[in-house]
Amino acid sequence: MPLFSLVLLILGLHCAPPNSCEGKITSCLSPQQNATLYKMSSINADFAFNLYRRFTVEIPDQNIFFSPVSIPAGLAMLSLGACSSTQTQILEGLGFNLTDTPVAEIQQGFQHLICSLNFPKKELELQMGNALFIGKQLKPLEKFLDDVKNLYETEVFSTDFSNVSAAQQEINSHVEKQTKGKIVGLIQDLKPNTITVLVNYLCFKAQWANPFDPSKTEEGSSFLVDKTTTVQVPMMHQMEQYYHLVDTELNCTVLQMDYSKNALALFVLPKEGQMEWVEGAMSSKTLKKWNRLLRKGWVDLFVPKFSISATYDLGDILLKMGIQDAFADNADFSGLTKDNGLKVSNVAHKAMFYIGEKGTEAVPEVRFLNQPETTLLHPIIQFDRSFLLLILEKNTRSILFLGKVVDPTEA
């Protein structure tokens, strides 16, 4: 049976925008004018936290990192070619109620989301891209090709999958080019009967609004991995005004660090022994509550400098979330092609991210202002044990990245 492979790639790095997107995003609607985006962000957030909780079961006590916007976008694009229960399961698995939100509205929502994320922003490089590699022997429907190009700004390539090594090289070369060499050899074991590969990637680069002074980074600070394990990490230090709060209901401290433009990071530090309680309570409503209660004030802040990466095969997890027919022999992708027997073989997701003194990647030198020396009246927030990390795009409130840092020394 011919196989469909879905590869979801996310980078907290600098990437080159795809040529096919040039000239398309200049007419993008302002997110403030489109209520669909806010509805989408809430649904995607709840999907993100549900998926996150699945990860905590599958890989307990380990670093977790993925893109809550990249995965739904890739699956929603896949649903364009799905019909009947195959399509229904994909969209309902993403958290959509098809009675309240028709399929056309969902696809329009993702179109506006991608358009808004790709809209040029000063001092913030953010780009979501899609590439579809279709076997030369497959006869895709024109409507499907038009939809993936117009709704998802997808580049489509006709690929000879009969030559597995050449097809693999073509895909890897495209990914390497789009990520400016950051990802080399993404696909290593392309299956011989693969006939279509969909690649979704999200690239991000930004500078902190208040960069850390590298001279204040302590190289050998202790980070508690568990009750018996401590590792040494570079710990960044800064006295600055941040939005923060103590959530007494969830027993955690929340700190917001702004990027220079249109993005922010939420660091969530549960009290010792309370991580599972916080994880179980995370939802779109929780984010809205924090957004309402965060207050700005001076903080003596300690945050580890680290990189994190993760690779997942999402197949088993998506099956448990109700997306089953797409992987079965009776999968219905008649919206993609009239050829019979196409099914999804695997859904791979790769995520990479780096946090340092200046942001997610090295940027031009900046000047550091003198900070107040007195710390007696300022709260000390020290991320020296397991914490949660969320990166959000401000305009759409979309969660770009979501993760848990258990051991910052494990890249």
Curated annotation (Swiss-Prot):
> Signal sequence: where?
1-15
- Which Gene3D superfamilies does the UniProt record give? Alpha-1-antitrypsin, domain 1 (2.30.39.10), Antithrombin, subunit I, domain 2 (3.30.497.10), Serpins superfamily (2.10.310.10)
The record's subcellular locations are:
Secreted
GO terms of molecular function: serine-type endopeptidase inhibitor activity
Residue numbers binding thyroxine: N291, K394
Coiled-coil annotated residue ranges, if any: none
Q: Which UniProt keywords apply?
A: Glycoprotein, Secreted, Signal
Q: Name one Pfam family in it.
A: Serpin
Residue positions with a glycan: N34, N97, N163, N251
Tissues where this protein is expressed: Expressed by the liver and secreted in plasma.
List GO terms (cellular component aspect): extracellular space
What family is this? Belongs to the serpin family.
Question: What task does this protein carry out?
Answer: Major thyroid hormone transport protein in serum.
Q: What is this protein called?
A: Thyroxine-binding globulin
**Gene from which the chain derives:** SERPINA7
